[in-house]
Each structure stands twice: as structure tokens, then as C-alpha cells.
């Protein structure tokens, strides 16, 4: 049911002028696909929830979850909240949340790196001419994605065997924590990216980010009612985003 278009190499070049199409047979385009800044999406969803009567408690740690005959009691460092339903959507803390109610939620955070380059003259020229931003480009053979970012490019690899982190859950002080980058792990992806998009190799690297991202054993998120618990719902392990 996904709306896709099959493109010829010439059509790929028209949509992504910086792409080397000399060895391509074709491509698949998702016309309605896109990306959104996570902070903007979070604020929009929070605003929508508040408009519908929800209350959001920021900087409030959950220290325990207890089941009762009527529902649940969520214990926090600022008091207890009684409720009928609980939804676990705690990201890197999924395993810790599960342990509070006796669940082993199979979600493990692993290190994920991505590279941000300096601005490229061709991209700046496109912006100046008012041309649309090139969409997200994915190369399945070299296992990476790429898109524009502030006049430059972002390269994100799909690494094999990326190191696990926070196996027992992150500490309470781990918010926004980043790890040491490892460019050796990225070398095959960088090589493939330069072949497919030569412009990527023509500019300097502005920053390499290495942070935690959640994965499940099969790569799919876990969404739905928890096994063996009434009115406890799970929404964990989304890895690369919301579909």
C-alpha cells in the first residue's frame, strides 16, 4: 500500500543533481516521504496534547510503577499519579521501565553516528536560486542515507555491529550524552557516499555525532498491549523515527 515511483537514472539525476548515476539501473521514490526536526515535532505533539486536556510534567522522574485492582499507580520523585492505563514510551530507558512491571522489553540502545559537512557551493547556489531541497537519498548497497543540512550534507550509515550502549539502561544524568566518534567504522560508508555523491568528498567535515539509538532484534518497533499486564501499553524501539 506504499505509494512509490520507479525512476530511471536520468530521473534520479533530475531530482538529485549531485548524485552519480553512471552505474545505476534505477531507483524507487517515495513522493510523500520526508523528515521533520524532532524538537519541532515534539513541541507540536505536546501542544496538541495540552489542547485536548493532557497535563505534561517536565523534569519528573518515574521511580516505580505498581498495579492495583483499579489500574496503576505511577510513583515519581514529585508524588504519585493514579491512572487506569500506562503507556511506556521511554526510549533508551525502555528496559528500565519494563523492569518496574516485570517485563523484559527487548530494546537495546546502540551507538549511531552521522557526519555533517561544511556548506557546498552547489547547494548554496540551489538555495539562492530558490530551488527545492533535495530529498533524503538512500543507498542500500552502501547502507547509508544522505540529505541536505544548512547548505551542506548529512551522511548517516546503517552500521553492522554497532556497539551496544546502556545495556542495563542509561543513568539519570545521560540526557543528550554523546560518545567518542569512530571514523574507522564509517570508512566503508564514506567511500560509498563519495562514489555516489562526489560533492560529499569536496567539502570538509563540520561535526561527527555519535549518540544512542534504540533497536529491537528485528528492527521493528514494539507497539501495542503488553503481554500479561492489563492496561499497560508499549510504544518502544522506533530506532530511526516514526512511520
Region spans (language model):
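Dinucleotide-binding Rossmann-like beta1-alpha1 core, especially the glycine-rich loop
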Residues: 1-15, 141-146, 151-152
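A short alpha-helix-loop-beta-strand transition element characteristic
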Residues: 1-11, 21, 104-107, 202
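Helix-loop-beta segment of a Rossmann-like dinucleotide-binding subdomain
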Residues: 6, 16-52, 170-177, 230-233
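Short loop/edge segments at beta-strand edges and connector loops
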Residues: 8, 58-60, 207
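A short, glycine/Asx- and small/polar-enriched loop/turn
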Residues: 18-24, 66-73, 215-219, 228-229
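Helical element adjacent to the flavin cofactor pocket in flavoenzyme catalytic cores
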Residues: 28-85, 89, 93-96
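Central helical "cap/lid" subdomain
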Residues: 80-133
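Active-site lid/adjacent beta-loop-alpha segment flanking the redox-cofactor pocket in flavoenzymes
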Residues: 103-104, 120-232, 236-238
Amino acid at each position: 500500500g506504499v505509494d512509490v515511483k520507479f525512476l530511471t537514472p536520468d530521473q534520479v539525476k533530475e531530482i538529485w543533481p549531485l548524485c552519480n548515476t553512471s552505474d545505476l539501473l534505477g531507483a524507487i521514490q517515495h513522493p510523500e516521504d520526508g523528515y521533520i526536526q524532532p524538537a519541532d515535532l515534539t513541541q507540536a505533539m505536546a501542544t496538541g496534547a495540552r489542547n485536548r486536556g493532557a497535563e505534561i510534567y517536565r523534569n519528573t522522574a518515574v521511580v516505580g510503577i505498581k498495579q492495583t485492582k483499579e489500574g496503576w499507580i505511577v510513583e515519581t520523585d514529585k508524588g504519585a499519579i493514579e491512572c487506569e492505563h500506562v503507556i511506556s514510551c521511554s526510549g533508551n530507558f525502555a528496559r528500565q521501565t519494563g523492569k518496574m512491571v516485570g517485563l523484559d522489553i527487548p530494546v537495546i540502545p546502540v551507538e549511531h553516528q552521522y557526519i555533517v559537512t561544511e556548506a557546498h557551493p552547489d547547494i548554496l547556489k540551489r538555495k539562492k536560486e530558490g530551488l527545492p531541497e533535495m530529498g533524503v537519498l538512500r543507498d542500500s548497497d552502501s547502507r547509508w542515507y544522505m540529505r541536505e543540512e544548512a547548505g551542506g550534507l548529512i551522511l548517516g550509515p546503517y552500521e553492522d555491529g554497532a556497539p551496544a550502549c546502556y545495556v542495563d539502561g542509561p543513568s539519570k544524568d545521560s540526557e543528550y550524552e554523546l560518545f567518542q566518534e569512530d571514523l574507522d567504522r564509517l570508512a566503508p560508508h564514506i567511500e560509498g557516499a563519495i562514489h555516489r555523491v562526489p560533492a560529499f568528498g569536496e567539502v570538509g567535515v563540520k561535526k561527527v555525532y555519535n549518540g544512542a539509538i534504540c533497536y529491537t532484534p528485528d528492527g521493528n518497533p514494539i507497539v501495542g498491549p503488553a503481554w500479561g499486564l492489563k492496561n499497560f501499553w508499549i510504544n518502544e524501539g522506533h530506532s530511526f523515527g516514526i512511520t
